[in-house]
């Protein structure tokens, strides 16, 4: 397979948390993580499983969403959407929504948003990547192994887009 093209979609969320307690260190805890949705389509099987003359084009989009569950608790969703095509035909399509519940305490307001939208998805990513690799392998293809994703860059791009939109 050709190296996949990853298209990050910037995270969006409005997040709030209590003011930090003076003298206390910020704390980030994983309360749980879980698979919310998984879909794998192999629409042209068994023909798609035959040896191919050319490597498929693989496009992957990545999206992060978060929401408050309580004063210091957040759900963070990591959405991975992968599609492999050859000559305009879909070879396989996979859609994964993996999430975690996190407790963030004693984070200053200016660090809360980056912690939730950078650090939390960074913790979820290895598990989501493994599920996607297993799904493609179980679909009869080589495992789709994604390179690590720089969630900091995704976050910074979103901030730049928001600033550009605000100035326009």
Residue ranges and their predicted role:
Residues 2-123, 127-168:
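N-terminal intrinsically disordered, cationic/polar leader segments
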């Amino acid at each position: 397979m050709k190296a996949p093209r990853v298209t990050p979609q910037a995270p969006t969320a409005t997040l709030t948390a209590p003011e930090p307690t003076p003298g206390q260190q910020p704390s980030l805890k994983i309360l749980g993580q879980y698979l919310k949705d998984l879909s794998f389509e192999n629409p042209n099987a068994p023909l798609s499983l035959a040896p191919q003359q050319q490597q498929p084009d693989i496009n992957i989009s990545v999206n992060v969403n978060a929401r408050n569950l309580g004063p210091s608790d957040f759900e963070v969703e990591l959405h991975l959407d992968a599609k492999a095509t050859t000559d305009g035909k879909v070879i396989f399509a996979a859609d994964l929504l993996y999430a975690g519940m996190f407790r963030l305490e004693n984070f200053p307001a200016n660090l809360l948003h980056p912690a939730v939208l950078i650090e939390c998805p960074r913790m979820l990513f290895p598990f989501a990547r493994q599920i996607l690799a297993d799904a493609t392998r179980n679909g009869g293809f080589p495992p789709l192994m994604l390179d690590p994703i720089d969630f900091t860059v995704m976050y910074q791009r979103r901030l730049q887009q928001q600033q550009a939109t605000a100035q326009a």
